[in-house]
Amino acid sequence: MNKLKLFVTGDIGCYTLGFLPPLSAIDTCVCMGASIGHAMGLDKALGEEALGKVVAVIGDSTFLHSGITGLLNVVYNRGAVTVIILDNHTTAMTGRQDHPGTGCTLKGEETFEVDLAKLAKSLGVKHVKMVNPYDLAAVERVVKREVKRPEPSVVISRAPCVLSRRERAVSGKPLAVDPDLCAGCRSCLRLGCPALAWVKEEGTNTRGKKRKGRSKIDAFLCNGCTLCAQVCKFGAIKENDGR
């Protein structure tokens, strides 16, 4: 979102932690369901000036709890608002409880599962897109296109919570930083991943670029999501065959 210079109206959930550095990705956070109302207010107050500059983010459980009426309000009042539903298929922030979108009751019994895409369309949203949050380039393309629409749109960013026991979350080979190629730019560190660390080490890499340190990946914490490799412009992050 920072890359696209968007004003992000946030909500209540694990993504609220993105308000703080190094992500600094959220600009407002008041209460559950407020993100969509805030984005709608900015759209009406700023008019065309807000087009392509504001996006609301809300988790799947929070959306089902108190975001549906906000989205309906956007459609009813013809707002040009893009809502990104961060769907990790659980109520992650408070202990990974089930909700109407998981297909299970709080007792763990199988039940009806709400389809978020169909729900958004039933409220009158014509443009509903699904993205994989682990494909940064695809997410950027979709968000850039949707925020420019002069009408409501919804982007569902779907991937299981990495702590989920029921669903298999993203899991690949752990990655490693090639110390000879790392330029020390810290782009990977700005992801806020707990597996990444900074090693103070003045010198130059094999390309002759001076640096004050380099990144390092703890293979035991890395789940192989590849986000760090995607943001590295120097090809310094690759698969690590050994733990």
Residue spans for each PLM region:
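Conserved helix-loop functional segments at active or binding sites
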Residues: 6, 14-17, 41-51, 194-202, ...
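Generic long, charged, amphipathic alpha-helical segments
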Residues: 44, 50, 174-181
